């Protein structure tokens, strides 16, 4: 009895899945296999394929002509829509005309069921070519391409549901996808838009060290000899430096000179030699020229005491009073020694000593060491250990120097002296003015500073009738008499009175009995005033050496 295979067509799908289902091929071996027992309790499995008796080849009826035409039309529409979406693949397929023309030539000679099988194989070959040509090899490569036709997917899904799966057979390995190729997605430009504005930032400059001419390393040299003399005696001290300075280095002198030869800046990306930082060199002294502060060898001079006071008023005048350093050369000058007509090759300066060409060369560039900030102060720094009871100072003055005396008191207070003045102790002084003045006059440990001015001379030597209305002048006259009595009682020797000439005062304004002592000027002699209050001498005598050896020559 002949059987016919009914075909169900699902019109809801875009492509009928049942029409794309390939017809199973039957072999004589399958006819000899007995049918598997049909057990009701057995769970349905994908491997249990033969649940119904297989169709014999003798009982097989060909598919109707209408179904075959419908299948061919669906396949043609699927291929046409696929090549419209992927036109580049159509060119690749056309190039392989030798391999693709053979199945097409055989379609007319084969039966309809075999023609469909060859068409399905061709579609599978197109799918493998599409997977190999796909440029997406990233983490989303396992996802299906939305542009693929649904006919292929429906054909495979329908085939797995309605027909048994073939057994895996050993065969040639399928064509694998191309290996991962670096694309723009793996670089710094993978972001479509620069959110943080990184591309607009300037590229960083090379790391350099900010140093000045005085901070450059140099060889150890003597401060008592000219550098040119030491270069002749010790030629190994000369440092070989690169010939071309870097125009971008902040220590380069030409970087700050608008008219210099290196005024133009090198664009970013050019190489900068690492040794360009040490290109800043100075010219050695010419023969016969001695650096400032340099002296010939001989006995050491008498050492001088240098004070380090920290007065606010002294900040403006300290460079002129205490700065004994060498005059520094300006940073915008670059010196080179005379070449004497012979110039060394530039590339030889960067080579090691054993690879440099031998022969007469120009003297190499040498960096002159930075002179000390205070070369004359070669003694040992020490702090004065003046006891607290010897730091008391009392000042007597007239009203014409009141404002200047306040600055002078501030100078003494900053330097550690307990200075007493009637302006700062007016409340205590108001209890008993005479007793307040005598407390400082009778204490022999208190140093008394006399502020000399034209008004002071008038107050101490004028008639008392002229001071009736000036109470401060009367107190100044009383203090002057007490000091004069002490001076006479000490045998006309001055132990603690320090006359200081304030502005607009001359030495003729000093009282007669004080002219036989040291008279200082403010603010010119502030250092000497501090030394006098510290009971220290300005110059310290050198240590005593041994007696000379005498050579006795007999007659």
UniProtKB/Swiss-Prot annotation:
Pfam entry (one): SEFIR
Stretches assigned to the SEFIR domain: 390-531
Cellular component aspect of the GO annotation: cytoplasmic vesicle; nucleus
Catalytic reactions of this protein: S-ubiquitinyl-[E2 ubiquitin-conjugating enzyme]-L-cysteine + [acceptor protein]-L-lysine = [E2 ubiquitin-conjugating enzyme]-L-cysteine + N(6)-ubiquitinyl-[acceptor protein]-L-lysine
Effect of residue 286 to G: Impairs IL17A-mediated signaling
Keyword Transferase annotated: yes
Record-listed E.C. numbers: 2.3.2.27
Entry keyword annotation includes Phosphoprotein: no
Top-rank taxon: Eukaryota
GO biological process: B cell affinity maturation; B cell apoptotic process; B cell homeostasis; B cell mediated immunity; CD40 signaling pathway; cellular response to cytokine stimulus; cellular response to interleukin-17; cytokine-mediated signaling pathway
Function: E3 ubiquitin ligase that catalyzes 'Lys63'-linked polyubiquitination of target protein, enhancing protein-protein interaction and cell signaling. Transfers ubiquitin from E2 ubiquitin-conjugating enzyme UBE2V1-UBE2N to substrate protein. Essential adapter molecule in IL17A-mediated signaling. Upon IL17A stimulation, interacts with IL17RA and IL17RC receptor chains through SEFIR domains and catalyzes 'Lys63'-linked polyubiquitination of TRAF6, leading to TRAF6-mediated activation of NF-kappa-B and MAPkinase pathways.
Protein name: E3 ubiquitin ligase TRAF3IP2
Organism: Mus musculus
